[in-house]
Amino acid sequence: MSLFGDTIAYLLSLTEDGEGKAELAEKLHCWFGGKEFDLDSALEWIKNKRCLTDIQKALIGASICFLKPKDQERKRRFITEPLSGMGTTATKKKGLILAERKMRRCVSFHEAFEIAEGHESSALLYCLMVMYLNPGNYSMQVKLGTLCALCEKQASHSHRAHSRAARSSVPGVRREMQMVSAMNTAKTMNGMGKGEDVQKLAEELQSNIGVLRSLGASQKNGEGIAKDVMEVLKQSSMGNSALVKKYL
C-alpha cells in the first residue's frame, strides 16, 4: 500500500465503526487522494465533527497539515492542546528529545515508524506537536511515519479496552456491550440503507433493543431475548425479524 493509503488506514483505525466513520473515510480519501482542497475548511470540518475525540481530531488535523504545510496560516488550538496536554514533564522531555535528535536524522516513513514504536504514547504526542509547530524541519514521510506509529498504539489500547469489556465477568457489562453494538449497527443501517425493507428492519431493531433495555437483565427471559436479537443482527441478509417478533 502507498504512503497515503497506510496513513488513511491508521487514522481510520482510531475511530468507532458507524456512519461518521464512513463519512470521515470519504473525506480522507479525497484529501490524501491528490484532490485540491482548502486546508482551513478541512480543519474546521474536523474540529466540528462530534463523533471524534479531542485526540482523534488533533491527530487527523495534524496529518492534513502535514500534507500542505505551506498553506498553514496559523496554529490550531484543537491540535496543539491535546498533543501537549498529555503526560508528565519527563515524558514531554522524551518527546522533545525524540523530535529534535532522532527524527531530524530520519529520511523515510518506515524508519520514523520503527523509531517511534519504541516510545510511549505521551512522548509521541509531544513529539508530534514539535513537528506540527516546526513543519519545515521534517519531511512529510517522517511526520506521517511518527503519526502512524502513534495511531497503532492508540488503536491497540482501544481494542484491549473493548475486548476487556466484552469479556467482563459482570453480566450487565457484557449485555450492554451487545446492546450498544446492536444499536450502532441498527442506526448505521437506518442512516445509510437505501431500501425500505432495510430501513424498516433497522427501525424494528432499534425499537426492540429499547424494549430489551426496559425489561432489564433481571427478567427471567431477558438474556435469552437479547441473544436472539443479536442473532438477528448476525444474519447475512439482515432480513429475518421473525425471531424477534416471536418474543416481542
UniProtKB/Swiss-Prot annotation:
Main location: virion
Chain location of the short sequence motif Nuclear localization signal per the record: 101-105
Membrane topology type: Peripheral membrane protein
Gene Ontology CC: host cell nucleus; membrane; virion membrane
InterPro entries from the UniProt entry: Flu_matrix_M1 (IPR036039), Flu_matrix_M1_C (IPR013188), Flu_matrix_M1_N (IPR001561), Flu_matrix_M1_N_sub1 (IPR015423), Flu_matrix_M1_N_sub2 (IPR015799), INFV_M1 (IPR037533)
Keyword vocabulary terms for this entry: Host nucleus, Membrane, RNA-binding, Viral matrix protein, Virion
GO molecular function terms attached to this record: RNA binding; structural constituent of virion
Region spans: Membrane-binding: 1-164
GO BP field: viral budding from plasma membrane
Domain of life: Viruses
Keyword set includes Membrane: yes
Span list, region RNP-binding: 165-248
Compartment annotation: Virion membrane; Host nucleus
Subunit structure: Homodimer and homomultimer. Interacts with NEP. Binds ribonucleocapsid by both interacting with genomic RNA and NP protein. May interact with HA and NA. Cannot bind NP without genomic RNA.
Other comment: B/Memphis/12/97 is an avirulent strain in mice. Influenza B virus genome RNA segment 7 encodes the M1 and BM2 (AC Q80DN6) proteins. Normal translation produces the M1 protein. The M1 termination codon overlaps the BM2 initiation codon in an overlapping stop-start pentanucleotide 5'-UAAUG-3'. Termination of M1 translation triggers reinitiation on the BM2 AUG in the +2 open reading frame.
Family: Belongs to the influenza viruses Matrix protein M1 family.
Function summary: Plays critical roles in virus replication, from virus entry and uncoating to assembly and budding of the virus particle. M1 binding to ribonucleocapsids (RNPs) in nucleus seems to inhibit viral transcription. Interaction of viral NEP with M1-RNP is thought to promote nuclear export of the complex, which is targeted to the virion assembly site at the apical plasma membrane in polarized epithelial cells. Interactions with NA and HA may bring M1, a non-raft-associated protein, into lipid rafts. Forms a continuous shell on the inner side of the lipid bilayer in virion, where it binds the RNP. Determines the virion's shape: spherical or filamentous. Clinical isolates of influenza are characterized by the presence of significant proportion of filamentous virions, whereas after multiple passage on eggs or cell culture, virions have only spherical morphology. Filamentous virions are thought to be important to infect neighboring cells, and spherical virions more suited to spread through aerosol between hosts organisms.
Alphabetical list of HAMAP family matching this protein: INFV_M1 (MF_04068)
Protein name (database record): Matrix protein 1
